[in-house]
Amino acid sequence: MTASCPPPSTSEPSREEQARALCLRLLTARARTRAELHGRLAKRGYPDDVSTAVLDRLAAVGLIDDADFAQQWVQSRRAHAGKSKRALAAELHTKGVDNDVITSVLAGIDAGAERDRAEQLVRSKLRRETLAQDDARVTRRLVGMLARRGYSQNLACEVVLAELAAERERRRV
């Protein structure tokens, strides 16, 4: 004996169901902020009331958490890209994270840790450089590399000059 299956639904899914499906597809690729998802829904033409309802539901079940997103983003970008606090704050702001959340997440990074990370980046690049008598080219490249990662000009120059001197001393031995 076979059980009969109910006939497939011929009605279209509601706008809210479509919006939820879109958000879930986007969230399977990577974590996203509430603002990112809201922007994608708006781009697809979903009304604000539908977007708000869907995003509130996703936040209630824990699929959207801007504070957790910001924490993971900072850890990942500091470890893999060597970004400074200033660059991380700009990236999070672009992603739509609230300023209070950004401030609290970045409060855990002190100036000493920032300097240590800059030194690590410079050391790793210096190992592959050939040092000539004129350090201007190497200095310019290393300071530029740190500047692109958001480090201040002052810190970048200090770190590069100190690490360049240390590398010269190490190679002499």
UniProtKB/Swiss-Prot annotation:
Q: Which family does it belong to?
A: Belongs to the RecX family.
Q: Does the keyword Transit peptide apply?
A: no
Organism equals Mycobacterium avium (strain 104)
Compartments where located:
Cytoplasm
Keyword Ribosomal protein tagged: no
Kindly state which keywords UniProt assigns to this record, in alphabetical order: Cytoplasm
Q: Which InterPro entries does this entry report, sorted A to Z?
A: RecX_HTH_1st (IPR053926), RecX_HTH_2nd (IPR053924), Regulatory_RecX (IPR003783), WH-like_DNA-bd_sf (IPR036388)
For this UniProt entry, what is the primary localization, expressed as one broad class?
A: cytoplasm
**GO terms of biological process kind:** regulation of DNA repair
User: How is this protein annotated for GO cellular component?
Assistant: cytoplasm
Q: Which Pfam families match?
A: RecX_HTH1 (PF21982), RecX_HTH2 (PF02631)
Gene that specifies this protein: recX
Instruction: From the Swiss-Prot or TrEMBL record, give the protein name.
Output: Regulatory protein RecX
